Each structure stands twice: as C-alpha cells, then as structure tokens.
Amino acid sequence: MAVLTHSRRALSTNPLKTSAPLGAAMAYLGIEGAVPLFHGAQGCTAFGVVHLVRHFKEAVPLQTTAMNEVSTILGGGEQIEEAIDNIRKRANPKFIGIASTALTETRGEDIAGELRAMQVRRKDWVGTAVVHVITPDFEGGQQDGWAKAVEAIVAALVPVTAERDPDLRQVTLLVPSCFTTAEIDEAVRMIRAFGLSPIVLPDLSTSLDGHLSDDWSGHSLGGTRLDDIARIPRSAVTLAIGEQMRAAAPMIEDRALVPYRVFQSLTGLKVVDAFVRVLMELSGMQDPPPSTKRDRARMMDAALDAHFFTGGLRVAIGADPDLMFALSTALVSMGAEIVTAVTTTQNSALIEKMPCAEVILGDLGDVERGAGQAEAQILITHSHGRHAAAALHLPLVRAGFPIFDRIGAQDTCRIGYRGTRAFFFEIANAMQAIHHRPRPEDFGAAPIPQEFDHVPHPAPC
C-alpha cells in the first residue's frame, strides 16, 4: 500500500498537473455539436486552447465569457447569457458545456442558480442543451474536471426511468480522461467483437481523432450524439473504465436502473482478461472470438520478448492517478520496479493501491529529483518531462497530456491485448535505444581485480 506524500516546497517547478477546467472542456468535446465555454477571463481560455491545439493538432472550438474587472466584482450572469446567445448565433451548437474557473469560483458566484433562471426565461434556447460544472483551477486536476463533467452530463441528459426495458446487446461505455482516441477505438472494437453495441460517453474518437471535414464548423465534429445519451437507460450494463468514472456509473443506475461494472484499468493481462470475461457473460459466448484469442496470444509472446528489458527495470512515472496506476501495474507485472511516482491530485482511491511505497503529490521537479535519487532507468510522463529526462540522461516514454513534441499522440494505444502488447514493445525499445558510450574509466583507468593482478612468469622450455 502506497502512502501519499505532499511536496513541501515553496514553489512549483515545471508543473505536472493540467487544470480541472481543461479536463471538463475535453469531456464536453466528446459530445456531438458541442462548444465548451469557460466562465472566466480570456487568458484562461487562451491558455487552454494552446494546450489542446498543440496536443491534438486540430482546431478546437473553446469559448469564453471574457470576464473583466467590473463583471468579476458585480457578477458574471450577464456575461454567461450573452456568451450563450453569441455561440448559438455563430456556431449553432447542440450542446454547450460551461466550466467555471478559479476567478469565478473565488468570487463565489451562483452560476447554477443563474443558469436555471436563464433557462426558464429564455424560451428561445430550446434545442440547445446547456450543462454547467464547478471546476476551480485550484482544486483537483484534469482527471477531476473530466469526471465532474461526465457526471454533470449524466445528471442533465440521461432520462429518469421507472421501469427497465433493456436492449441486451447495448452497453454504455464510460471512458476516462487518460484514454486516447485510439484507445477508445480499441475498447469499442473489443466490445463489438462480442456482438455488443456500445454507447461511448464521452467519445473523443469521433471528434478529436484527426479527420478532415468538408466544411468548417464552430462546434465539435463528431462525439456522442444527444439521442444516444437519451438511449442510455436501455443499456444492459454500464462499463466504467478508470476509478474516475466510479461516481458517474451509479448515477446512471440511480436514474435509469442500469447495473454497472467498474474496471480500474485495461492495461495488462489480468485486467484485460477480466474485461473479456464480462463481455463473454454479457454476450452469452462460451469462448472469446478467434480474433480476441489471437490478440491475447500475441500479447503473451510480446511479454516473453520484452521481459528481458523490463525485468528489474527502475521506473519513474509522473501522471494522473488512473494513468499512473494502469501503466505502473502493467510494468510491475513484467518485473519492473516503480522507484518514483508523482501524481496530480489526491482525489483517487488508486493512489494507495499503487505498487510502490510512496506517491508524491507534486510536479515534474519532484519527478526529476526522485528519479535521480532512486537511480531510475526510464521516465514516463508527458512532453514537459523532456527537460528532466535530458538532465538525467534517461529515455522518455511520453504518456498523458499534453504531448506536443510528437505527431499522432492521439493514435497511441496502450489498452486491451493489442495496446498492452504495443506498450511492452515501447518500453523495451526505449531501453534498447540507449547506446553505451565508452569512457576511459571503462578500460585502462579501471581497477584490475586482484585475481588478475600478477606478474606473468615465462614458461620453462
């Protein structure tokens, strides 16, 4: 059981955490025809847009209420109403997701109450779903903002149902913030292989997967349809991936009587096997499909090939709790050792389940310091960790958000049998790529072992 330790430094160096409003915005972008709206200053939104555009390499429709000195003091209700009007006129969205920021939450504004009054008064807003979530920058991180946004979407858009009328082939898939678009695709592929039809919430795999559109649009292109969210009560079960989705799943059960299963991770043999067993149970299959069996056999072979490099490997990792837990447990199952673990938020039950003695709530400065002291051999974190990797002369495996110095970050897959196989290869290849540079002390300057320290005598004739 890991112990959570708070970093006791007077400043943050090279931050690891991404803010909660940005996590909420990413969840909103997984809804079809959506426009995320930050209730705060223009700079908050501009900074978020830069992060999203650099990571996904796509245009992102992120809007702001543009709070100024006067509206911050007197209240920003008028700003919200004006922003929604402008967005509806210019982008014609089906969904507007509002995320508060540190500015408005520090003031203590009753955004939810103001929004309810607006929706009663503004009958012309009919046809545009508006959802609000409280996400101050100073509380939690990206994972927390994503989870709160999903919970708000469920509370606002999933109908309350008194009686069950399930479609036994339909399942609801709640995905975590750490899933890439390729990982959502892989989870959907695995579910469909068993003859099941998933409703993904939120679905970034069809909105931020990097596809060309014929026309420009001011809202998200793709994502979970509002009609599909309304059909969630007919699902046979809710499959929640990641500890961050543990609160949203029972909300669906309370509203629509849909049972749920929570999977803390989908990276590694045991957890994927457990996921497949549930899919077999839901589909009524006695054996997995041949393609699934083949994927499992390939993953097992990859584990055999990679264990020469992962056995005894000393790993330093910095990530959100769900991603940190998923990658760490998979590596420990391959014989690696987590010597440094730094995370972004304390709001996760997975922290104490980490396969290490200590988890630090800190930044990349803590990652660099801990990795150096523990003599780590590899570093796993997002692109901002490249400075620590260079300083320590360690290979860097980029994981998490943001990844801006590589193209195709959204196409990385580390879940399921296929993704776990790719992850093992990724780690092994990162270690193989380290080239040893000979130094003088490796040769003549090195001490000679005592058993070889002797004067040779000529052999008698």
Swiss-Prot record:
* Annotated Pfam families: Oxidored_nitro
Q: Which domain of life is it from?
A: Bacteria
**Which keywords belong to this entry?**
Metal-binding, Nitrogen fixation
State any GO BP term from the record: protein-containing complex assembly
This protein's pathway: Cofactor biosynthesis; Fe-Mo cofactor biosynthesis
Which Gene Ontology molecular-function terms are recorded? metal ion binding; nitrogenase activity
Does this UniProt record's set of keywords contain Repeat?
A: no
Residues that hold [7Fe-Mo-9S-C-homocitryl] cluster according to the record: C44
Q: What does this protein do?
A: This protein may play a role in the biosynthesis of the prosthetic group of nitrogenase (FeMo cofactor).
Record NCBIfam families: nifN
PANTHER family (alphabetical): LIGHT-INDEPENDENT PROTOCHLOROPHYLLIDE REDUCTASE SUBUNIT B
Concerning its family, UniProt says: Belongs to the NifD/NifK/NifE/NifN family.
What's the protein name? Nitrogenase iron-molybdenum cofactor biosynthesis protein NifN
What are the leading ranks of the lineage? Bacteria, Pseudomonadati, Pseudomonadota, Alphaproteobacteria, Rhodobacterales
Gene for this chain: nifN
